[in-house]
Structure formats: structure tokens, C-alpha cells
Amino acid sequence: MLKFTRALLSLIFIFPFALAFANPDFSVIKAQAKLSDDTYLAAESMAEHLQEQGQTLVHQATFVNSQVSYLLSEKDGVQTIAIRGTANLENVMLNLNVSLLPDTKLDIMLHQGFAYAAKAVYKDVKPYLVAGKPIQTTGHSLGGAIAVIVAMYLKMDDYPLTNVVTFGQPKVTNVSGAERFAGLPLTRIVTLQDIVPLVPPLSPLQIQELDIYWHLGEEVILMGNNKFSITSGIKSMLRATKFTSAIPSEQNLTAHKMTTYLGLVNALTKKSTEVPYKMQISLFGFSLE
């Protein structure tokens, strides 16, 4: 117990609770949500839908072996890489239970499946990127995880990465990996009942070695009723301790859908109120709020 306590205190020291966040721009988030949703379209209708949003389709590709698909579009000189996720929550849950392996390029530990897919996307998209033009990445579900790793590669290669927005994104790295890429301009959009960003849950055995899956970036929780909360670091991680069931409910399935995210974000573009996220978790007799 003492070792666990020391480890948790170390995490609190590395990733403090109180950080200053700028108010999220939900019009920007909505634009990224639309692009993430566009990745689920059939290839033949994608260009037309993008044009309706003022976007020009530059390139689209699907990798048959992995079923990973992405699009590269451009609007007002900004390039966006949007990566498709999956609508099958059971497949997501199965893919999350994979060991972390070292990535020699980034010098961090990564989820091996996400890293493999991200390398394929990055290799394929590089010839289509215009040097000097701003780049942003986005994606839903597993696509969000791949979008984060692609953003890491872009940052390492000194591309002008300006924004990363993901929806229902699972964790991709561990504590040291999150610390190394703490400067990544990442905003993670989640819903209250979406369990994908929460798993795998916190394990006392893993936390003793500080080798647990860990999120990076700012977390914006869509609460419904035009309300949202913002968390990060240890507070974001502790949300996972409230998840105890590995069997997704119908409510969880709905909460993970891209259509759910689009509806909640669209409402927040019209009216938004930030509220504190109440974890209802105590540590050493103190409430962590």
C-alpha cells in the first residue's frame, strides 16, 4: 500500500490537477468533428461532402490489410489529416488490450497496433503534404489514437503542426510518453458515458511501476444540456477508476458514436457553459475535485 501511495503521489507531482485552460472554440471543434465523420463516407462521395464544407480533397487511402482509412484535405491553406475509426465498440475494446512497445523514432512506448497503423498513414501521406503549410490531425475512436501518433511524427519532423482534435480516443502511450509529448496541441473530446477513453482502467500493480497507459492533452467532457467540463493529467486518469464493467451497455455504444459527438458539439456552438467535473473520489481522506 505504501508503494502504491508513493507512486500515485509521484503521478500527481508530474501531472498536477490545476492547469489553466483556454475556453475551447467549439466552432473549430465542430469543423474537426465533421471531418472525422467524413472519413466514414464512401470514397466516391467524399469529395462532394468535403466541398460543401469548403474543403478540397487532396488524397484518400484505405489500407486493405488493416482496414485503416484516412483523408487529406485543405481549406484556406490549412492541411488536415482525418483518420477513420470504427463504429464497432466491441472491436475497440479488444484492440485496447495490447502491450506497449518501444517506438525508436519517438523514443517512447506506444500501443503496438496504433503505432503500426500510424506509420502506414504517415508514410503514405508525406508525399502529399505541402511544406510550410499548417497541418492539423483529427479522428474518432481508433482513428483518434492514430491521429495522435501521426501528430507526434509530424512534430518530430518539424512540420508546422497547429492542432490535434480527437473524439472518443483511447490511450496510446504511458506516463513517460505523455510527459515527453506534453507540448502536443491536443484536445481530446469525450462524452460522459463513452468508455473507450477510460480503458484499460487504472491498476494498482501497474501504477507502482509508473508504466500505465496515460492520456496526454486537454480533455473536454461533453456533459449534455449545453454544458462541458475540462480535465487533464491525474484528474483525467482517475475518471478511469470509476469504470468497472468490461461489457459495454447500449448507453456506452450510443455515447461512442460519432453522431452523438456531432450533436453535442453542435449544441455547444450555440450555447456553452463550463461546469466543474465532480469525480466523487477521495484520496487519503481528501476529495479530489
Give names to the regions the model predicted.
Residues 1-9:
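Bacterial N-terminal signal peptides that target proteins for export
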Residues 8-18:
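Bacterial N-terminal signal peptides
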Residues 21-138, 142-289:
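Non-catalytic, mobile gating and regulatory segments of ester bond hydrolases
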